[in-house]
């Protein structure tokens, strides 16, 4: 079994750019950014429970990274960058820390490296279980209306929130709930030590208005790019800024 994805071919000899979306997104999420890099072959992946991979269920990060590796093999991707936002960034970091063959580097936008104590993990597990129950039982428009009121999305205006609620409500609530629980921060290990000892290039993007993830970025041994005029979802709020940063990264 492999994950559903959309492949766009570029010039031979350059590494692939493998894009991983955030929670409730799909393979279209990164395309405005990715299509600015037409020289590179691009793979836009649907993570389990989302888009064309909605019927694929997993028990945890090991399953997700295993499926990702099988997907890369199926497309004969031997040399690549992982580019991930939020949940996709966490998947990218988890996969990269397993020393993937052919990995050139990782670009993470607003991805959490992991909670650092049992109290934080217990609180996150309670919160994610509550959200998962709502995704399973309530209309998605109502759930996402509340989801985008969370502090991390404080930079969004009303029009942006309404647009995201409408877009994300096309998902399957049950499969979102299952993926939320399977890949909760409560079950993700703290990756800080692994990332400090890494052998791959590691870049971190965060919006200038995303104070939580700017603080997290400062804890990581990463080359950090702050995206102007953007909050947590920087590639949606300022795609040109993310394109400029990614272009700079790929020139090295």
UniProtKB/Swiss-Prot annotation:
Matches recorded under Gene3D superfamilies: alpha/beta hydrolase
Keyword field: Lyase, Menaquinone biosynthesis
Molecular function, one GO term: 2-succinyl-6-hydroxy-2,4-cyclohexadiene-1-carboxylate synthase activity
Keyword Lyase in annotation: yes
InterPro entries reported in the protein's UniProt record: AB_hydrolase_1 (IPR000073), AB_hydrolase_fold (IPR029058), SHCHC_synthase_MenH (IPR022485)
Catalytic activity: 5-enolpyruvoyl-6-hydroxy-2-succinyl-cyclohex-3-ene-1-carboxylate = (1R,6R)-6-hydroxy-2-succinyl-cyclohexa-2,4-diene-1-carboxylate + pyruvate
SUPFAM superfamilies, per database record: alpha/beta-Hydrolases
GO biological process: menaquinone biosynthetic process
Its EC number(s): 4.2.99.20
Lyase is among the record's keywords: yes
Pathway connected to this protein: Quinol/quinone metabolism; 1,4-dihydroxy-2-naphthoate biosynthesis; 1,4-dihydroxy-2-naphthoate from chorismate: step 3/7; Quinol/quinone metabolism; menaquinone biosynthesis
A Pfam entry, by short name: Abhydrolase_6
Family from the record: Belongs to the AB hydrolase superfamily. MenH family.
NCBIfam families assigned to the protein according to its UniProt record, in alphabetical order: menH_SHCHC, PRK11126.1
PANTHER family in the record: 2-SUCCINYL-5-ENOLPYRUVYL-6-HYDROXY-3-CYCLOHEXENE-1-CARBOXYLATE SYNTHASE, PROTEIN PHYLLO, CHLOROPLASTIC
Biological function: Catalyzes a proton abstraction reaction that results in 2,5-elimination of pyruvate from 2-succinyl-5-enolpyruvyl-6-hydroxy-3-cyclohexene-1-carboxylate (SEPHCHC) and the formation of 2-succinyl-6-hydroxy-2,4-cyclohexadiene-1-carboxylate (SHCHC).
Subunit structure, interactors included: Monomer.
Protein's name in the database: 2-succinyl-6-hydroxy-2,4-cyclohexadiene-1-carboxylate synthase
Organism: Escherichia coli O127:H6 (strain E2348/69 / EPEC)
Gene behind the chain: menH
């Amino acid at each position: 079994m492999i994950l559903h994805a959309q492949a766009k071919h570029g010039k031979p000899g350059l590494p692939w750019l493998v894009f991983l979306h955030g929670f409730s997104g799909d393979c279209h999420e990164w395309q405005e950014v990715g299509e600015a890099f037409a020289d590179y072959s691009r793979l836009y992946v649907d993570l389990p429970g989302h888009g064309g991979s909605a019927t694929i269920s997993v028990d945890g990060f090991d399953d997700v990274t295993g499926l990702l590796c099988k997907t890369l093999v199926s497309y004969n991707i031997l040399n690549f960058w992982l580019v991930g936002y939020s949940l996709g960034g966490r998947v990218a970091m988890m996969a990269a820390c397993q020393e993937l063959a052919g990995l050139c580097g990782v670009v993470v936008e607003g991805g959490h490296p992991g909670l650092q104590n049992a109290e934080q993990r217990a609180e996150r597990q309670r919160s994610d279980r509550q959200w998962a129950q709502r995704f399973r039982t309530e209309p998605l428009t109502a759930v996402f209306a509340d989801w985008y009121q969370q502090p991390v999305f404080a930079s969004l205006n009303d029009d942006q929130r309404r647009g995201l609620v409408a877009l994300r409500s096309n998902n399957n609530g049950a499969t979102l709930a299952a993926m939320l629980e399977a890949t909760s921060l409560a079950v993700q290990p703290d990756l800080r030590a692994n990332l400090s000892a890494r052998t791959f290039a590691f870049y971190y993007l965060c919006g200038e208005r995303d104070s939580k993830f700017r603080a997290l970025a400062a804890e990581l041994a990463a080359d950090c790019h702050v995206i102007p005029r953007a909050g947590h979802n920087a590639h949606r709020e300022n795609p040109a800024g993310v394109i400029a940063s990614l272009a700079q990264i790929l020139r090295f």
